[in-house]
């Protein structure tokens, strides 16, 4: 189960970093305690059934996320004209006398 959750968190983190947002996922588990033994057995059965349903839903969600996950989305940008990897996406900046990197512009 921990392996399943770590894969789920990895997929969520990769999709979140693609959009430059961070998503924090938390998983909680609860138990119900009753003093009545008859109700306790019924509640334990209900809880185990709910956990089984949730684990099936989690596995389905994980499969859906893995299908959407595409390795090509994380490849670095390659300029089709200059074949430069990870360079500027617009026209050549030195040709137009300015350079912009991470929101900072310098003119020369």
UniProtKB/Swiss-Prot annotation:
Q: Where, subcellularly, is it found?
A: Mitochondrion matrix
Q: Where is this region: Disordered?
A: 33-59, 79-108
Segment forming the signal sequence: none
**Which residue ranges traverse the bilayer?**
none
Record field: compositional bias (Basic and acidic residues): 95-108
GO cellular component terms, alphabetically, are: mitochondrial matrix; mitochondrion
Q: Where is the composition biased (Low complexity)?
A: 33-46
What UniProt keywords apply to this chain's record, in alphabetical order?
Answer: Chaperone, Mitochondrion
| GO biological-process terms attached to the record | mitochondrial respiratory chain complex II assembly
Q: How does it assemble?
A: Interacts with SdhA in its FAD-bound form.
Biological role? Plays an essential role in the assembly of succinate dehydrogenase (SDH), an enzyme complex (also referred to as respiratory complex II) that is a component of both the tricarboxylic acid (TCA) cycle and the mitochondrial electron transport chain, and which couples the oxidation of succinate to fumarate with the reduction of ubiquinone (coenzyme Q) to ubiquinol. Binds to the flavoprotein subunit SdhA in its FAD-bound form, blocking the generation of excess reactive oxygen species (ROS) and facilitating its assembly with the iron-sulfur protein subunit SdhB into the SDH catalytic dimer.
* PANTHER family for the chain: SUCCINATE DEHYDROGENASE ASSEMBLY FACTOR 4, MITOCHONDRIAL (PTHR28524:SF3)
Q: Which family does it belong to?
A: Belongs to the SDHAF4 family.
Q: What is this protein called?
A: Succinate dehydrogenase assembly factor 4, mitochondrial
Origin species: Dictyostelium discoideum (Social amoeba)
